[in-house]
Amino acid sequence: TVIDTDWIDQMFKDNAKTQSYSLGINGGSATSNYSISLGYLSQEGIVGGKDVSNYERYNFRINTEHKLYKDVLKVGQHASFVYVKNTGIGVGNQYNNTLRGAFSTSPLSPVYSDNNKYDSPYNDTTNSDWFNVDSNPYGVMMTNNNNLSDNQKWIADVYAEFQPIKNLKIKSVFGINYYASEYRSYTPLYRFSIYSYNEAHTSVSQNMSKGHTMTWTNTAGYDFNINDHAISTMIGMEAVRFQG
């Protein structure tokens, strides 16, 4: 039987789903208003399918504002949260990436066989008389896709604006930007050709980072007119603190 492997067809998967849902609620009165939204996005990768490359995002946002004492004082807040979870294939570069091997590997080389020394179901061309330089792009992709990334970000602020007299506005805003991310990966021992192998050691890696930025901004502005001229003045200060 002549082997005729369509490597491109093997790498790409049909019917990769994308799902997107959102819910928004808005309301208010003469002195108050609010806006709330929820969202979810899921996208399966067309290369390798959902078990190899998959993206999920959850997001939440809420904004409110209230006017007090006949608009003399205005207070409010903004808050948003985003959580992203994804797995993905190795991107590499123009010379070495997951898909490049699929374009150059011989169609006479099979995807699966029982000749792999590490009990992998994917074919190893090392001992082939003709194709030992060809790797197994599908086997490489499925073996090296053991990674998971989690990212979350929280942005929020509260503010107050005071107008003691007409055209004079004094405003104070305190905000925080918090982030946290984690990445985990696992690479087993493998061999797929004389050039594509990892026989040194199994490796596991985990990275984590988090931090936040706090910002406090205070401004005072006064608007007035002189004849046909409109003039705006403002003074302010801002303090920023970062930790991470």
Give the role of each language-model region.
Residues 157, 161, 168-174:
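Charge-patterned, long linear interaction tracts outside catalytic cores
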